[in-house]
Structures are given as C-alpha cells and as structure tokens.
Amino acid sequence: MSALNSLPLPVVRLLAFFHEELSERRPGRVPQTVQLWVGCLLVILISMTFEIPFVALSLAVLFYGIQSNAFYTKFVAILFVVATVLEIGSLFLIYKWSYGEPLIRLIIAGPILMGCMFLMRTHRLGLVFFAVAIVAIYGQPFPAMLDYPEVVVRLTLWCIVVGLYPTLLMTLIGVLWFPSRAITQMHQALNDRLDDAISHLTNSLTPLPETRIEREALALQKLNVFCLADDANWRTQSAWWQSCVATVTYIYSTLNRYDPTSFADSQAIIEFRQKLASEINKLQHAIAEGQCWQSDWRITESEAMAARECNLENICQTLLQLGQMDPNTPPTPATKPPSMVADAFTNPDYMRYAVKTLLACLICYTFYSGVDWEGIHTCMLTCVIVANPNVGSSYQKMALRFGGAFCGAILALLFTLLVMPWLDNIVELLFVLAPIFLLGAWIATSSERSSYIGTQMVVTFALATLENVFGPVYDLVEIRDRALGIIIGTVVSAVIYTFVWPESEARTLPQKLAGALGMLSKVMRIPRQQEVTALRTYLQIRIGLHAAFNACEEMCQRVALERQLDSEERALLIERSQTVIRQGRDILHAWDATWNSAQALDNALQPDRAGQFADALEKYAAGLATALSRSPQITLEETPASQAILPTLLKQEQHVCQLFARLPDWTAPALTPATEQAQGATQ
C-alpha cells in the first residue's frame, strides 16, 4: 500500500484498471481461455509442420473467432468462411486488372475499402465486411514486394488455407469436442448473482460499484439472447426464463445497497429474512437443475408487516410472482431487427467515416511506397483496425493497439535475445510459447475495454518471431519494423480522425442522458401496486435503465478523450453528465424504496403524486439537449385527512425530492451544488 501511495495518480488508476480486468470472473471465461490457448499451440504446430505461411494471420483468426460459448463460436465460424470467400475473390479481381499498375490497383481497392467500411457501420453483419477490408488492405503490398505474379497468386491461395484451417480448428475445439454451452453459463451466472444477493441480505457489506452491477445485468441479457438461439427448452419456456432473468437482476441490484443493520433486529424481521433467503436458495437449486421454479409460499400478515418494516416487501412480491408464474406462458413475439440501420443512406457520417479510413490508408500507403520500407506495411492495417465511429472510441482503440504492440514487441525482443538461441526442436518451442499464449488468451477474454491488448500482443509477437520462418530467427529488424508500422498508422489515424470530419459525442451525450431520464420517468408512472403486469413492466424498464446508465458512463469516458474540444467545456460537460448519472442511479433506488410503503395506499391517490415526480423529470430531461435544464424543485401536494399518506412514504418521497434538487443546473456557467433545498424536503 505504501508503494502505491508513492506512485502518481494516473499510474495507480492504470494498475487498478488492469487488476480489475485481469481478475474479472465471468461464466465461460476459463473454458474460452483454455480453448484459445490450446488452439494457438496447435496452430503453431500445424504451421511449422506443413510450413504454412502467415502464422500471425492464423492466430488472429483464432483470437477473433473463439467466443465465450459454442453457439457464438459456430456463428462466427460461418461468417469467417463467407468472409474468406469474399476476401480472396476481391483480391484476385484487384490483381487481375491492376497487378503491375499501383495507381489502378488503388483506384480499384479504394471503393472496395470504402464499401466495406460503410457496411461495417450500417449492416448487422459488419464483422464480415471488416474482415474483407482488412484483407483488401493487407494484400496491397504483395505486388510491390514480389516481381513474379505466380508467387503472388500462390501466396493469395495460401491465404485461403491460413483463414480456413484455424476456422475448422476452432469449430472442432469450441463446438464439437469441448463446447461451452450458453445455457450452462446462464445457470451459473444467475446463481452467482443470487449468491451475492443473499450475502448482502444477511450481512452488512460494502455495496459493489454500480458500473459492475450494470455490466452484470447486461451480461445476463446477452446470455439470454444466446440461450434463445441455442436451447430448445429455453425457447419453449422463454417467457418464464426471461422473467427469471429480470427478477434475479432486480434482486441482485436492489440488495446490493441493502444494509440489514439499518433496521431493528426484531424476531419477526430476522425470521422473515431467513425465510426470504430460503426461498432464494430454492430458486437457485431449481436454476442449477434447469427447472422452472414453483413456490408454494404464501405470505402471512405478520410476514408482510415485517417485510414492509425492513423494506423487502417489493423484493418478496417480485420473487413470489416468479414462483407462481406458469412455465408454459406463451412468449411475446420477438420483432426481427432490420439488417441495416434506419439512417444508413440519409446520415452522411457513415460515408464520411469510410472516406476518412480510406484517406488514412492512402497516406500510409504513399509513405510506405515512397520510403520503400516493406516492414512497415502494418501501418495500413492499423488505419482500418482503429477506425471507430467517433473520436473517443478511436483513441481508445489506438491506445489498446499501441499497448498490445508494445508488449508484444518487448516479448519478441526478449524471446529473440534470451530464448531463441537455446531452442533445438518444436517441443521446446511450444513449451516456451505456452505461457506467452496463455497470458495473451487470458487478457483477450477480458471485457471489451482491454481484450484487444491480448490479441494485439500475440499477433505482434508472432509477426516478429514466427511469421514465414520455420526455424530459429535472430532478426531484430522485424520487431522494429512491425512496431514502427503500428506507431505510424496510429499517428496518421489520430490526425485524420481528429481534424477531418471529427465525430464528436459531446452533443450526443446530453441526448443520451435525456433518454435515460425519460426511461426513469416512465418507471415513476407505473402504478406502485403488486399487480403482475405492472411489476413485469417495471422490471423490464429497470433493466433498460441499467443499460442506459452504463451507455452514458461509457460515452462520458470517450468524450473525455476528445482533445479537439475546449478543455474547460469538456470538463464541465463530463462533470455535469457524471452528476446526472450518479443522481439518476440514486433516484432509481430511492424510488424503489417508495414501493414498499405505497402499496398500502389507495390506487387513486398514487398516480397524482407519482406524476409530480415524472413531470418534473421529463421537463428536466427535455432541456438537456439545449442546456436549459435547471434543478427540479418539487412541492409535494397536501393530501386530505381522509387520504393521509404513511409517514414512512412521506419521508421516502422527501428523499427523492432532495435527489431531484441535486441534479446539476445546466444554465449556470460552472457546475455548483444546489443551494436551495427542495420544498417539502427535509435534511
């Protein structure tokens, strides 16, 4: 701890980031890592045995192809086969008509690249077109490097083998021999979330970060999509299982902030918590066996009173409604998403994005050809790989690519100097490569925030030490050239994406926040009663809120990297946005607490009171895009004596008023805390 205290704050944050990423535990990560690790070793063995060139490309196919579950791996494998056909076909067309004419070759390759980049952003199968763009650029240096067309044709045909045999290998490993099923991962993930919920229910624990809660909720939704596509039983009972996922997400996220020491430990409350934990355990056992859980628990009047006293009545009712739901309830028909985005041919940003990528590639190709430096051809690949929809995400990808390339180059240098002279056979080579590939595979299976580092590290290492050589290599020039090529491509891309039609998210961020607050206002308009339809709607919108707040958080991180913006305006926008996100999360949890007390009131009274909060929030959200939003000041209406609300509910709603008043004032020149207290609220 003392050593960390002496380090600069950015270094400490970087170390904390890598610690979080490397220690991440999610269902399916270990099997995916092992599959990727074994696949890499088999690729090296096969390529060295049969002298197949482009080892780095084969490894890249594995790293992009092996996914967290068998269904996703099979789907990506099919896409890779289609992409390989398109890639090689486009290359042969380019070579046929322009082999000896670099200018004509670029004229033909340019529209292909632009079309692929355009479709990558607008089509559902963008991964296919991304692969075609990569190969179209990767094959441009071949005619300049080789004077014999026959050799170029052979190398191009080898690309078919290089792309397809790793695809076959990952299908055998990840789909046929050692499949990791999505349904198994879902059962494990649901039980892990319920374990965390029980721990917070029975013990006073520090709440987990809200970003982690939201990522876990999104992970469950992604697994649900794979289960629907991969498991027939899940599809048959999909309505129950989707309700189960929503219920578990709600219990997990709500109990994360629950503190049992905040309530009196009466015997009735203790017994009720034990009963609730017992029911959750029964749900866990049913999930582990793949069965739809049915509960015969009927809450008594004393248990209902204890649940209300310790703010657990809503969780209890939500759990019981799941236990009493018919497993054969017909699912809601799913709407098929369109293959293209709605504004594909009306939004100029997509075509500008393709033009920017082409411009960056042409600049790198001109420099590469002008200096006659074959080793830096990775600069053109870099321009395609780091091309992202906006400036912030492009900078993130550049940092990941540079970091991975740097680590890979260092490992390649150490490997060439210290290890390569002592190797005599393929077995020794595999033993030495095993820990490097294992490290790269573990990093590559982390979250999207850092996974590309592992892929780039292994590919850079292979390019420098294993590419097109089938014996010991001691050439340090390869290491230098690959790293410099990546640096040149990164610099050119940074300049182009920053100053040529920069796609900033600074204007989109307030709109994104307004959308999240709009969903929160919809939650407030749902009647706070234990009615089946209302509760299911509430749970589904709540999951959407987790996704919305997480998307806003990630957008804030990207906007922070947009250095073309004025520094003060950028800092003010980020500070205000983070305050809105933080207060929005707090308002959501505070509104949850009002459900327990509001259930005891007459239905006719609640919509009027809830409508005050929803109207104020919608008005605030409507002004975010134009920076005209002021901190809402809510005056709670007095109720007639015959409809007097519970003191607990009044106190909870006053707390919501206080949270509303802490929303930032976007009309002020600088972000200052609210000085006026919300009317009707107490400190």
Residue ranges and their predicted role:
Residues L125-F129, V175-Q188, S447-S451, V477, ...:
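Juxtamembrane/interface segments at transmembrane-helix termini
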Residues P10-Q32, M48-E51, Y72-V81, K96-L103, ...:
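Short, amphipathic, aromatic/basic-enriched membrane-interface segments that mark the entry/exit
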Residues V61-L62, A354-T366, I376-A387, F402-L414, ...:
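Alpha-helical transmembrane segments of multi-pass membrane proteins
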Residues L418-V419, L423-L430, A434-L438, S446-Y474, ...:
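C-terminal functional regions that serve as terminal interaction/effector modules
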Residues L9-F18, T33-K74, T84-G89, L106-I173, ...:
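Pore- and pathway-forming membrane helices of multi-pass small-molecule/ion transporters and channels
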Residues M1-V34, L41, T49, E150-V151, ...:
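Long, hydrophobic alpha-helical segments that serve as membrane-spanning/inserting helices
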Residues F92-P102, M145-V151, L417-L418:
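Transmembrane alpha-helix boundary signature
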